[in-house]
Amino acid sequence: MAVYDELAGRLVLITGGANGIGRAMVEAFHVQEAMVCFCDLDEKAGARLSKRLGDRAEFAKVNLCREAGIKRWVAHLAKRHGDIHVLINNAARDPRIALEDVTAKAWDDLFAGNIRAYFLVCREASLHLAKGASIVNFSSITFYTAPVNMSAYVATKAAAIGLTRSLARELGHRRIRVNTISPGWIMTERQLSDHVTPAVKRQIRMEQCIPDLNQPDEVADVALFLASDSSRAVTGQEILVDRGWVPG
């Protein structure tokens, strides 16, 4: 892991930080000596992670589908810790639902958590962002690979890319950068337990240019770069972390 000295002491907000890629990012920013504030619905996992990391790691249970909860969380952190330097919108669900089974409610619920929440967190955080701050929104290579039974999810991830590009233009005059990370199939605990069979692993290795399995900490490394001053000239962009499943 690279060390970015400028991240020490900076306030970092991460949604969906209790497990998987989110947890890897919380841990990575904590190593950089940043003040890491993260939210999740998984209260047990979030509290456990915060306790393990100790100082400079603060967890809150927040339902990102509720605007009032987002407002309270962001305002509280800004009042307690000051300007926000890094915001990472990571929280999302990726259900596998056939087209004919996607109800209007299921569609609306998925958009509420996967993209409406991103917008609301960005809106509230924008009131407290430091000059030169960095926002990272998560999309997915499924926008390009278009897997079956994930049409609603893929639509939310397409929207995340559009949100990033628009906000990069809107916030650029404040020297605020906005970028997207689109991970490939990452070997989180949930993916390994729910979806990644031996056959899937073979498929992954076959599809990728580099036939190694993607790990959460590798995504966290890219998030660190986008949060650091080393990426000060990078905004409105999308970085795919997929070992070449989707060649550029």
What is each residue range found by the language model?
Residues 208-219, 230:
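A conserved structural motif in NAD(P)-dependent oxidoreductases
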Residues 140:
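Residue(s) in the substrate-gating loop at a strand-loop-helix junction
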Residues 1-4, 145, 224, 235-248:
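Short C-terminal tail/terminal secondary-structure segment
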Residues 98-99, 103-111, 200-204:
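Substrate-binding pocket helix/loop in short-chain dehydrogenase/reductase
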Residues 127, 169-173, 232:
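Alpha-helical segment proximal to the catalytic Tyr-Lys
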Residues 88, 172, 177, 234-236:
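Short, small/polar-rich loop/turn modules that mediate ligand/substrate recognition or access, typified
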Residues 122, 156, 164:
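Active-site helix of classical SDR
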